[in-house]
C-alpha cells in the first residue's frame, strides 16, 4: 500500500471515529484497528449537525486530546515542536461574510487555542479541523513534525501534486493561516451563495479514487448518493474516495 493510500485511509478512519460514534474522541484506541470497511458510507461521512457544531470542545479538552496522541515529543533540535507544545503569534483577521468572523491578534498562542478560536470564528466543529490536520499532514500524531507540515497544515492551497507552490511567507501558510483559511473554505462550501453547488444532496454523484488525472493508469471512480452538505464540503476540499480494496 502506498504512503498516499495509507494517509487517506488514516484520514477516513479518523473521520469514522470522530463522527460515527465508533469510539470516543479521547480514547486511546488505535484508529486502524477500529476501522471496518463495511462501516464506511461515502455518501455520509459526517452529518451536517455534527460538522457545523463548533461548540463541542473547550480549549482544555482540545489540549488533552493533543497530549494523548503524542505522549512523548521527539522534535529535532532546530525543528518545530509537536502540535501539543506548539505556540505562535497570530495576526488579526478581518473576517469574511459566509466564511469566518473576525479574530484579534494574539501573542504566544497554543495550537489548542488556535483550533478553538478558528472553530468558533468559522463555525466548524473543532473535531473536523483536527481530523483534517491529521489527514492532510499527520500533525495530530506527529512526534517529529517538519516545517512543511506546519506550513501546509490543513492542505489549503498546498496540493500534494505541487508542494512547491506552498511557499514560505505566504498569507495562506502556517498553522493559523491554514486553519483560518481552510475552515473558512469548508464553511463556504455549504453556503448556497457560493459557486460550489454542483454536488447536490439527494442526488447520485461520481467521485474519483485518485485525484490526479494525469496518471498513466486510470483508477476509476465510484458513484453513490450524497446524503449531507457536510460530506459534499469534504469532497469539494478533497475530491477522491477509497475503493473497496483499499478499505
Model-flagged regions — what are they?
Residues 97-102, 139-173:
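Substrate-binding clefts and substrate-entry loops adjacent to catalytic sites
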